[in-house]
């Protein structure tokens, strides 16, 4: 009997180590090695950033409330951070993966991110946040599934398909950095990739020898298609020839379900659609991601083309590509599409209660921030991009770490809540000092000449209005105060504004940035610091034990000594191992 007890104790402990949780929230673990490989997505050999040798990287697939551990080993020749746009990192900005909250991972070092997907579902991605590296890869999809007890507001699809799309240059990120550092714009991209591959040869303008994406499907089946634009600066129109896209979700919120023939996906955005394979199989069908709001004749090469292949298809796709239904020469017509996106107020989200049960439209606004972007300008002889006349310079010590160790003068809490036209553009480490549990509105005013995407870490905000012109207080009467969708990345058209509402219930330091990589690199960002003055450990987590130190705290950083075969263990895993040892010792004592 004692031997049997010992055996079951061993099995139980073994299961604990390998992630089978009998109590609490489960976890999933990933080991990511980021390194350079040579690839030719547009027919030209170039250096790209792979994750575990893959471009794009592996999918992170988890479920609401799961704990996610990602051990990142940096095999690049420069510092690295990974960030997780849209993952809210509740109480835990230490894991956000941007310079304001994390010290970079040096070459040949590793760092383990450890975060919980608290009360979230939906479609997201991960990507590098430093040194323009996203322009060379290092990205992949991040999927958060519903728990079994929370129903989805549509029939379970027959399968899932992920499309990672984005504009692409045949120069790597270091060459593109040099162009921006020299004071020049990047110019037109060399193409668009779909899942890391170039265009199908749909006409003679496409060179021979380019590998394209082919998606195999079965007739009559319905698939959930997740689309992520991880590109540099180009808004893309996504469409599948002769197939309707039924919009169901964006960045963690189920939407009112609407059919589209094509859909604009802006830089940094993620969407889910249901697509039914209801066409005849006389031929394959084109999958297209093409540049928007540009001269399409000049930008013809900036088009990604893949193939949708029915299992009973009788021939290849041929003929011209399907065109977008929206007139790109009239941006106000295109704006009607995002205006039509509404929250499904009767659907459950991450919890069983309806998404619309939080009545944001009935809460008084405590503060308004108008964040204005302009075309890049020269500051101290260098090309820079600004918000409210400030081009952000990251402090040498991450801000929350500086707070924790009482480092003075690292940053300033004086970011203006509206443009200061009387002041010249300047460089600064100025951030927003926001009030915990406040309810703010942020107006993104885009006075640049290009469409932009704005993102706020740590939060989902309600997109209540967008329009052309200059925002003013009297526009509040046009807000959608009932079923606005909540998301983390929103488009702002040139010469236009977008208004969002945010409930400040997540303590930490959170990045506010433009997702267009060229503008972000040039300084178009800031941070929002939200501190609970009565902090007692319940609203913000302590720094992790593996926190890295840099800047004024560099002397606190210990050297890493590890072999490539050694996997980093998280605190949770160490606790499980300790528990296993205790169980084994106890059982062994009884056995003896």
Curated annotation (Swiss-Prot):
Residues 565-592 form a propeptide. Glycans are attached at residues 61, 110, 172, 203, 259, 280, 295, 344, 364, 433, 447, 476, 536. It comes from the Eukaryota. GO terms for cellular component: plasma membrane; plasmodesma; side of membrane. GO terms for molecular function: copper ion binding; oxidoreductase activity. SUPFAM superfamilies: Cupredoxins. Its cofactor is Cu cation. Residues 1-23 form the signal peptide. It holds the Pfam family Cu-oxidase. Coiled coil: none annotated. It is found in: Cell membrane. Keywords: Cell membrane, Copper, Glycoprotein, GPI-anchor, Lipoprotein, Membrane, Metal-binding, Signal. Cu cation binds at residue 455. It is a lipid-anchor; GPI-anchor. InterPro entries: Cu-oxidase-like_N, Cu-oxidase_2nd, Cu-oxidase_C, Cu-oxidase_fam, Cupredoxin, CuRO_1_AAO-like. A lipid is attached at residue 564 (GPI-anchor amidated serine). Its main location: membrane. Belongs to the multicopper oxidase family. This is Monocopper oxidase-like protein SKS2. The lineage of its organism: Eukaryota, Viridiplantae, Streptophyta, Embryophyta, Tracheophyta.
């Amino acid at each position: 009997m004692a031997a049997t007890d010992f055996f079951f104790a061993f099995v139980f402990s073994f299961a604990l180590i390998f992630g089978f949780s009998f109590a609490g929230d489960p976890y999933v673990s990933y080991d990511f090695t980021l390194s350079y490989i040579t690839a030719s997505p547009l027919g030209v050999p170039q250096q790209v950033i792979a994750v575990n040798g893959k471009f794009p990287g592996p999918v992170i697939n988890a479920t609401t409330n799961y704990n996610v551990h990602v051990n990142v080993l940096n095999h690049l020749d420069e510092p690295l951070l990974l960030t997780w746009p849209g993952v809210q990192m509740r109480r835990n900005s230490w894991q956000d993966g941007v310079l304001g909250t994390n010290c970079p991972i040096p070459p040949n070092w590793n760092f383990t991110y450890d975060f919980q997907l608290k009360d979230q579902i939906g479609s997201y991605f991960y990507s590098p946040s430093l040194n323009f590296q996203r322009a060379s890869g290092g990205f992949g999809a991040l999927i958060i599934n519903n728990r079994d007890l929370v129903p989805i507001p549509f029939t379970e699809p027959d399968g899932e398909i992920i499309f990672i799309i984005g504009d692409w240059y045949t120069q790597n990120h270091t060459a593109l950095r040099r162009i921006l550092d020299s004071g020049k714009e990047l110019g037109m991209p060399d193409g668009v990739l779909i899942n890391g591959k170039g265009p199908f040869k749909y006409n003679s303008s496409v060179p021979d020898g380019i590998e394209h994406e082919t998606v195999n499907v079965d007739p009559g089946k319905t698939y959930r298609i997740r689309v992520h634009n991880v590109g540099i600066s180009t808004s893309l129109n996504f469409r599948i020839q002769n197939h309707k896209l039924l919009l169901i979700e964006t960045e963690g919120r189920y939407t009112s379900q609407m059919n589209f023939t094509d859909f604009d996906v802006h830089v940094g955005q993620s969407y889910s659609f249901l697509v039914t394979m209801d066409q005849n199989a006389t031929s394959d069908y084109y999958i297209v991601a093409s540049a928007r709001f540009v001269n399409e004749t000049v930008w013809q090469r900036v088009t990604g083309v893949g193939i949708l292949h029915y299992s009973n298809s009788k021939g290849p796709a041929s003929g011209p590509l399907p065109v977008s239904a929206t007139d790109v020469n009239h941006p106000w017509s295109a704006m009607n599409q995002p205006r039509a996106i509404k929250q499904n107020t009767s659907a459950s989200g991450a919890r069983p209660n309806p998404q619309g049960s939080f009545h944001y439209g009935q809460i008084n606004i405590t503060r308004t921030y108008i964040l204005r972007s302009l075309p890049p300008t020269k500051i101290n002889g260098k090309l820079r991009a600004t918000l409210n006349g400030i081009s952000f310079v990251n402090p040498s010590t991450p801000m929350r770490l500086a707070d924790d160790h009482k480092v003075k003068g690292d940053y300033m809490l004086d970011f203006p809540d509206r443009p200061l036209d009387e002041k010249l553009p300047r460089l600064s480490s100025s951030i927003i000092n926001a009030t915990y549990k406040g309810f703010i509105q942020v107006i993104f005013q885009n006075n640049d000449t290009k469409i932009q995407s704005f993102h706020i870490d740590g939060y989902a905000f309600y997109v209540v209005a967008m329009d052309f012109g200059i925002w003013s207080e009297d526009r509040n009467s046009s807000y959608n105060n009932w079923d606005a969708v909540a998301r983390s990345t929103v488009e702002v058209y040139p010469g236009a504004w977008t208004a969002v509402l945010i409930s400040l219930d997540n303590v930490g330091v959170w990045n506010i940035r433009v997702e267009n990589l060229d503008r972000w690199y040039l300084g178009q960002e800031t941070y929002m610091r939200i501190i609970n003055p009565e902090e007692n450990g319940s609203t913000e987590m302590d720094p992790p034990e593996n926190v890295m130190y840099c800047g004024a705290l560099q002397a606190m950083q210990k050297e890493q000594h590890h072999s490539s075969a050694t996997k980093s263990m998280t605190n949770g895993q160490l606790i499980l191992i300790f528990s296993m040892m205790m169980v084994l010792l106890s059982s062994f004592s009884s056995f003896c």
